[in-house]
């Protein structure tokens, strides 16, 4: 297998500055944001992907088995479903969206106080212009770590990186991440039941998680048919819990077509990531998805990425490995996969296969598995 890696921009090439206030009004867009013909979107496509609507209230009302079967069917097909009756306060969700508007509405220079450093996964990123030279996404993001074992880790991040005047944002996102953590562990109980390994198996594995929260802002684009808000990829993480605003843009590649998952204010979109696909021994799918943009209004979303604790070994439970189902991927740690996607490979639908090849090369060269 040939391992393809992304190339950083050449020193002599001037990276474009992604200033949403300027670029969203331009009739043309810089060439670095124009995607290849075979990857260009069809923003007006109305083909919808109807994913199962999972009522988490069934976990406490005697219908846990029904919930687990519905989740299993979705995860075996494409890995996407929505959850309702999730227990997250609607006022907290609304405030998280308001705080996102406040942050991305600031001048570029102010947002760059939280600038993401090369090789890191957290901080402010304006279209990843410092990381890639072409096929740039039409978006801004702010990413930060969350761990239930880290005291006020989100509050401290905002106060330290952006200043004390951003304490309210830190307070809101600390509470939001804590709520997402509880929701993700509840979903892990369902996934454990659905795979027949018990309710506690994956919940216990992720109790001490080291996760990522990301705020996504997709400005309007006057040429939405030429670019993408986020390119086609599978999430390398374990589980993604997404809340969309009222603007559609999330598309999933299912049954050979790009299909839209319409926003719902009272539901979270959940999808399986590569790390959980490995934990499930490839029984559940990490599916290709992307985000498209439009010419009229911005789109915003809140994404919580559940990741294992840094010292956890990603290996499927023994119950999922047998002669008919040998282990699909080598053992690895989340930091090793994260480093691979940040420094060596641009996430796509073949990330786990490329990562496996990279691990095998490292083992052949050094005799040790990357940590």
Over which residues does each language-model region extend?
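Peripheral, non-catalytic segments flanking oxidoreductase cores
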Residues: 1-371
């Amino acid at each position: 297998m040939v391992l393809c890696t992304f190339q950083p921009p050449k020193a002599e090439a001037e990276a474009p500055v992604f200033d949403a206030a300027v670029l969203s009004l331009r009739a043309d867009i810089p060439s670095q944001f124009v995607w290849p013909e075979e990857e260009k979107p069809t923003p007006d496509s109305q083909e919808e992907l109807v994913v199962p609507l999972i009522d988490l209230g069934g976990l406490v009302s005697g219908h846990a088995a029904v919930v687990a079967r519905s989740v299993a069917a979705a995860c075996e097909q494409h890995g996407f479903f929505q959850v309702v009756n999730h227990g997250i306060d609607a006022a907290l969700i609304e405030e998280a969206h308001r705080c996102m508007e406040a942050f991305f509405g600031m001048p570029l220079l102010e947002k760059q106080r939280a600038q993401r450093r090369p090789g890191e996964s957290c901080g402010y990123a304006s279209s990843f212009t410092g990381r890639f030279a072409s096929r740039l996404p039409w978006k801004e993001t702010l990413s930060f770590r969350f761990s239930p074992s880290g005291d006020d880790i989100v509050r401290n991040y905002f106060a330290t990186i952006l200043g004390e005047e951003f304490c309210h944002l830190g307070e809101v996102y600390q509470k939001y991440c804590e709520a997402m953590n509880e929701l993700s562990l509840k979903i892990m109980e369902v996934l454990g039941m659905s795979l027949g390994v018990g309710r506690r198996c994956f919940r216990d594995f992720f109790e001490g998680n080291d996760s990522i929260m990301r705020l996504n802002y997709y400005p309007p684009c006057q040429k939405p048919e030429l670019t993408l808000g986020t390119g086609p990829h599978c999430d390398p993480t374990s589980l993604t819990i997404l809340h969309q605003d009222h603007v559609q843009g999330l598309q999933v590649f299912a049954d050979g077509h790009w299909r839209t998952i319409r926003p719902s204010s009272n539901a979270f979109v959940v999808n399986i990531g590569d790390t959980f696909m490995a934990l499930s021994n490839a029984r559940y799918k990490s599916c290709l998805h992307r985000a498209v943009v439009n010419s009229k209004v911005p789109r915003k979303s809140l994404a919580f990425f559940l990741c294992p604790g840094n010292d956890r070994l990603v290996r499927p439970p023994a119950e999922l490995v047998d002669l008919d189902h040998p282990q699909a991927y080598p053992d690895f740690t989340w930091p090793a996969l994260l480093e691979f996607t940040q420094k060596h490979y641009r996430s796509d639908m073949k990330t786990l296969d490329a990562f496996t090849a990279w691990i095998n090369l490292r083992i052949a060269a050094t005799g040790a598995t990357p940590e």
